[in-house]
Amino acid sequence: MSGHSKWANIKHRKAAADAKKGKLFSQLSKEIIIAAKHGGGNPETNPRLRAAIERAKEANMPKENIEKAIMRGIGAIPGVAYEEVTYEGYGPGGVAIMVEVVTDNKNRTAAEIRRIFTKHGGSLGEAGCVAWIFEDKGSIFIEKESVKDEDQLIADALEAGAEDVQISGDSVEIITSPENFSEVKNVLEEKGYKITQAEVTKVPKNVVPVDGPDAEKVLKLMEELEDHDDVQKTYANFDIPDEILQSLS
């Protein structure tokens, strides 16, 4: 299982804790606002908004919160003016890191993100310094208990247009192209597989093995970035031993 997938699986399991802290709803609300702002308030004609609403519903976000976020996005009701910013940099061991934020104050957020990088032995870089290392992919996690036959799952996923199926322990992840993401997700749901998380994300084209003190520093860096209120998503190309990753979960 790739370093990306192991980390993605741990983040997925930590989502419940994020929800309890209230951060998940804040992230989802900001994503809906931004999606509606740039593509309009109709999910039928705005794929990004449709995906954001689906994620919000899966997280049991109240309907009124979703509707309010859409209205704020299209400017129908007043609210804070948010904008998207992507930061790029390096962590310990030369790990490439991308951080997507939604903020109402770019200067404040940039200073805080830079401080987090520096605190944990990393450095914030210029725009484009690591973006080339990542590519967009669809990521679909399936509840292991809903998989009766792993070979059949692999066949179903590949037939639907998936690029890869990664099974490890209690984790099952389907990787797709962005274009085939929705089709594969729909087919798997129709066949009875229980999807626990699905999104278009960024996957590294190559990974950097990291161990020992550097591995712990990288994980602390990633955790603090993800705990920041303005951070929506983080991506990194590390490959860290399972025992160190599991100590985080």
Swiss-Prot record:
Alphabetical keyword list: Cytoplasm, DNA-binding, Transcription, Transcription regulation
Gene Ontology cellular component annotations, sorted alphabetically: cytosol
GO biological-process terms attached to the record: regulation of DNA-templated transcription
Database matches in InterPro entries: Integrase-like_N, TACO1_YebC-like_2nd/3rd_dom, TACO1_YebC_N, Transcrip_reg_TACO1-like, Transcrip_reg_TACO1-like_dom3, YebC-like
Domain of life: Bacteria
Cell location: Cytoplasm
Keyword Cytoplasm: yes
Keyword Repeat: no
One Gene Ontology term of the molecular function aspect: DNA binding
PANTHER family: TRANSCRIPTIONAL REGULATORY PROTEIN YEBC-RELATED (PTHR12532:SF6), TRANSLATIONAL ACTIVATOR OF CYTOCHROME C OXIDASE 1 (PTHR12532)
The family this protein is said to belong to: Belongs to the TACO1 family.
Name of this chain's protein: Probable transcriptional regulatory protein DICTH_1505
Natural source organism: Dictyoglomus thermophilum (strain ATCC 35947 / DSM 3960 / H-6-12)
